[in-house]
Amino acid sequence: LILNGFSSTGSVVKEGEPFAAIFGGAWQRDSSGNIVTDSSGFPEVAIEQQVIGDPNPDFRAGLGMNLDYKAINFSFLFETSQGNDMWGGTQGVLRHFGIAPETAVESVAPVDLPIYGSSDVVPAGSTFRGNIGDWGGGLVALDQSWYSSNGGGFGQVGEQFVNDASWIKLREITLNYNFPSNLLDFLGAKSGQIGVAGRNLLLITDFKGVDPEVNL
């Protein structure tokens, strides 16, 4: 059962797999798990789509504290989600259009480098926009012809954009001041306070591109 997704990546319910597993295109691999490359050195795409990630965390937890000192109240709450995968669709789209940071670098070809989808090469010693890749079949040029095809978000392979999306957040922090009784009497009130609060002020994660709590 397909819940949602794109042509290269989706969320499915499949017997024997985690609920809402990330399902999509993957690189072809041999019996040892190594990526299979074509004659130019670029990775080949697996014939069938497969489960490429588990969005369900191993655990979620929170840690908070509420402190009072005289008329001042201070509280905070940390939350974490650990072990969940996420498909970075934003990263893939930025690569496709050549505006991701990794597509804007310049590299010098140490040898003649094959270009994806072409019989041409980047001549040894020349500078080109892009990176140098190696999947085990020799060095290749990762220029925009690669990123706008299977190296980007609109290609056939979603596996390359699935990463660990574990995170730690400072979910909330508050600081309040309770009005003293003489001020409350003057105002004719039983209680009152003034304070400041902030949410999601700190995010610790290795996931690139977006907040892993949001989609894509």
Predicted regions and their residues:
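Polar, glycine-rich mid-to-C-terminal structural blocks
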Residues: 1-30
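Hydrophobic, lipid-facing positions within transmembrane beta-strands of outer-membrane proteins
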Residues: 59-65, 72, 170-175
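Flexible, surface-exposed loop regions and adjacent strand-edge segments
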Residues: 1-11, 91-100, 207-216
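Structural signature of outer-membrane beta-barrel domains
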Residues: 1, 70, 81-85, 180, ...
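Membrane-embedded beta-strand positions of outer-membrane beta-barrel proteins
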Residues: 76, 194-196
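Outer-membrane beta-barrel architecture
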Residues: 26, 64-66, 174-178, 197
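Extracytoplasmic gating/loop element in the C-terminal half of outer-membrane beta-barrel translocons
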Residues: 21, 34, 83-188, 192-193
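Repeated loop/turn-to-beta-strand initiation elements of outer-membrane beta-barrel proteins
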Residues: 71-76, 182-183
